[in-house]
């Protein structure tokens, strides 16, 4: 399996497995500023990593409950390797780097979500689980279920050319196994905002305390990536 690696919609490298190594090979002519990771600047020689997927790409892989959902929904597309998992979830994510099966353009078209309804509704565990399954391909890595979505009340205007753009919000859920998790993050963000020492992403808490909506800082108002993110 060979994957295409894109930076801000531009194809810059190939990612594949060779024997017991993972390999990232930049395409000829790739500009220095189109690096995939701070740890892997553009160069002619391929980057290699033994046994496991490069750490930069592992940061984007789902885990826990979300990983189980991905396996259930996309099992036939998975071969047991992180490379196949990245092929399913890598097309849209946080930051400017996206990963797709070879020859496929980045981005995933998902139906907009009525966020105002989520903020006022009584959100059950089953209802949020259904949303996680629906938006599994635009899920965000981490143990807590969360995904990227566009608000139906904020239609994106056409840009005039095919360009990767993504949802403006991250939707996070809490259930009986993680009570008050959203509250904890929401009020932590509020405290940081009041301290005024660092920029803080805008966020909203649902009336029932089960849904947290965080506005993304890594995209502009059009949903276009404006910065890279590296954990």
What are these regions (language model features)?
Residues 1-231:
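Phosphate/dinucleotide-binding and metal-coordinating scaffold of catalytic cores
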């Amino acid at each position: 399996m060979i994957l295409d690696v894109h930076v801000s919609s531009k194809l810059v490298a190939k990612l594949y497995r060779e024997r017991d190594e993972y390999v990232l090979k930049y395409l000829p002519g790739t500009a220095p500023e189109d690096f995939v990771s701070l740890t892997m600047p553009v160069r002619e020689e391929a980057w290699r990593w033994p046994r496991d997927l490069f750490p930069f790409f592992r940061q984007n892989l789902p885990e826990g409950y979300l990983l189980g959902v991905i396996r259930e929904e996309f099992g036939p597309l998975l071969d047991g390797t992180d490379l196949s998992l990245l092929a399913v979830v890598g097309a849209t994510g946080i930051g400017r780097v996206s990963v797709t099966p070879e020859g496929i353009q980045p981005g995933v078209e998902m139906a907009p979500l009525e966020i105002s309804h989520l903020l006022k509704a009584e959100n059950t565990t089953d209802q949020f689980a259904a949303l996680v399954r629906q938006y599994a391909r635009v899920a965000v890595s981490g143990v807590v279920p969360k995904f990227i979505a566009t608000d139906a009340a904020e239609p994106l205007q056409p840009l005039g050319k095919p360009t990767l753009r993504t949802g403006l919000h991250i939707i996070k859920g809490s259930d009986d196994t993680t009570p008050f998790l959203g509250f904890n993050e929401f009020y932590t963000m509020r405290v940081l905002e009041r301290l005024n020492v660092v920029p803080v992403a805008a966020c909203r808490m649902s009336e029932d305390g089960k849904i947290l909506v965080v506005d993304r800082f890594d995209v502009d108002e059009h949903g276009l990536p404006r910065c890279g993110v590296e954990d």
